């Protein structure tokens, strides 16, 4: 006799695919996940995953020295991100994340799909709301939304070039209250706030990206292939 064998479905979740249908169909199911989300250990990545990961899973998948920061409060028009009390990733919640290891290939693991969305919102002393919004599928940003580039700078999206305002899935972006003059925000590491540089407008010509050979790539949108590029006279690497 052959014992019954339980077949667990493989659910692919990709940063470049519309995951809406497959996440809805598997909401609440414990499945084998195939995750395609490239991550760099050289800068803060924004993440938002449709599943929970505990400390053991994070250490196994991304390395024990991986760092997580969550949006905690607003102080002096700055969004402050701190290390969470527990090293864990909650489904649908946006984070800043820096893995110990660069992640270039697919990851395979067991997890329960949770198709929720928990945008993190905090108000300043005047009651104005600052939002850190996670997305699990490619999403079109509005002109006033802000994303974090691979150079750890903040950018408004390019609304003039078709498709340039779309960020890939399993990321997060920032929504500031209307009329706010906030130009920076802070990552708080072990009680020390490190400010990330001024917000840039990707519609400006001084944010044009070129290859190292001088070929024009286009305006910076945070979604460049691997390589060495030049922007504003400075070289930077996308891994």
Enumerate the predicted regions with their spans.
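Intrinsic disorder/low-complexity signal
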Residues: 2-3, 113, 203
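C-terminal outer-membrane/trafficking sorting elements
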Residues: 70-74, 192-239
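Short alpha-helix capping/helix-loop boundary micro-motifs
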Residues: 79-83, 216-217
């Amino acid at each position: 006799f052959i014992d019954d064998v339980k077949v667990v479905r493989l659910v692919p979740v990709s940063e470049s695919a519309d995951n809406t249908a497959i996440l809805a169909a598997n909401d609440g199911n414990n499945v084998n996940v195939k995750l395609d989300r490239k991550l760099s250990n050289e800068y803060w990545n924004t993440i938002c995953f449709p599943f929970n990961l505990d400390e053991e899973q994070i250490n196994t998948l991304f390395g024990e020295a991986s760092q997580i920061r969550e949006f905690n409060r607003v102080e002096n028009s700055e969004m402050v991100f701190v290390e969470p009390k527990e090293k864990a990733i909650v489904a649908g919640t946006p984070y800043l994340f820096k893995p110990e290891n660069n992640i270039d290939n697919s990851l395979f693991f067991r997890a329960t799909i949770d198709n929720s969305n928990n945008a993190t919102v905090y108000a300043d002393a005047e009651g104005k709301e600052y939002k850190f919004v996670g997305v699990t599928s490619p999403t079109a940003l509005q002109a006033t939304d802000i994303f974090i580039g691979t150079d750890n700078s903040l950018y408004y999206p390019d609304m003039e070039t078709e498709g340039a305002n779309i960020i890939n899935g399993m990321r997060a972006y920032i929504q500031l209250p209307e009329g706010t003059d906030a130009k920076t925000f802070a990552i708080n590491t072990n009680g020390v706030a490190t400010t990330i540089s001024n917000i840039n407008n990707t519609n400006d010509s001084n944010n044009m990206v070129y290859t190292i050979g001088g070929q024009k790539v286009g305006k910076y949108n945070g979604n460049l292939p691997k390589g060495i590029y030049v922007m504003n006279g400075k070289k930077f690497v996308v891994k």
